[in-house]
């Protein structure tokens, strides 16, 4: 019990002294996670769409060559960035680019750290999102693509107007999952000096050596951020699903199969009201009372 009281006192003392610093770290973490997730989704969307462009055996050689080349490059990108830790990716991008370009390309100053962090987390997120988008596109019924082609739509029109809207809705849980992962994985940006939430913890601990009490604040902070993100994303998913109070009209299955079912707001081709309307229309056409006649 005394240990818990001591822990509470240490946590309270740390928070009273460094609350603005902790909150600044939370702000930087959230901003980086949001921006990187958005850019990562764009990268993943482009890679997923390019990876699913179809080609026929009789297509031109150059078209098939470039499509195969694009798929190979996307595959290499996905495998490399999914198969290596983000902390090493940060080292290679932040320190490797200046090394290979003799400092012609470098990330200097506060803005340079921000730019490097956004690039690193975005590229990493894009590698995961590329496979999610590809899976979302493949999951759509092929009959919808065939129907779109049957009415004269091109591949890009079909993708933009038919496939992608459904695929994006299907991968919303993966987008939310990547956002939550990014909230936590931004902690590796301390390796390049970016002052996110975990880097703040390391700095404060270096000043007062209260490692565990500061870790408790970090744990509570990250858990709060991820829980809020989870609730918010579920609310967005429910909103995308639309109204859940739709009611199905009950009718006899034989009537439905025969095509004689009358919708409450419309008439069927076989009921009395519809027959009278058809007769009136025929008479108006017969006597010239058509559109354009006064």
Language model segments and positions:
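Transmembrane alpha-helices and adjacent helix-loop boundaries
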Residues: 1-294
């Amino acid at each position: 019990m005394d240990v818990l009281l001591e822990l509470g006192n240490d946590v309270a003392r740390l928070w009273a002294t460094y609350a603005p610093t902790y909150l600044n770290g939370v702000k930087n973490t959230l901003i980086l996670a949001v921006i990187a997730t958005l850019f990562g989704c764009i990268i993943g969307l482009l890679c997923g769409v390019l990876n699913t462009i179809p080609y026929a055996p009789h297509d031109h050689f150059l078209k098939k060559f470039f499509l195969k080349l694009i798929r190979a490059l996307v595959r290499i990108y996905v495998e490399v960035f999914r198969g290596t830790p983000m902390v090493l990716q940060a080292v290679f991008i932040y320190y490797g680019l200046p090394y290979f370009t003799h400092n012609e390309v470098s990330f200097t100053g506060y803005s340079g750290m921000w730019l490097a962090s956004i690039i690193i987390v975005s590229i990493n997120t894009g590698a995961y999102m590329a496979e999610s988008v590809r899976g979302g596109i493949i999951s759509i019924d092929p009959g919808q693509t065939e129907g779109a082609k049957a009415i004269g739509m091109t591949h890009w029109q079909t993708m933009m107007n038919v496939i992608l809207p459904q695929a994006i809705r299907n991968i919303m849980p993966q987008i939310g999952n990547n956002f939550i992962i990014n909230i936590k994985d931004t902690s590796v940006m301390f390796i390049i000096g970016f002052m996110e939430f975990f880097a703040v913890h390391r700095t404060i601990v270096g000043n007062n050596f209260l490692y565990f009490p500061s870790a408790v604040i970090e744990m509570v902070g990250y858990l709060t951020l991820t829980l809020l993100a989870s609730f918010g994303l579920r609310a967005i998913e429910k909103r995308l699903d639309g109204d859940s109070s739709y009611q199905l009209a009950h009718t006899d299955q034989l009537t439905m199969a025969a095509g004689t079912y009358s919708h409450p707001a419309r008439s069927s081709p076989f009921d009395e009201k519809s027959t009278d309307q058809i007769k009136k229309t025929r008479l108006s056409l017969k006597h010239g009372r058509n559109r354009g006649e006064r």
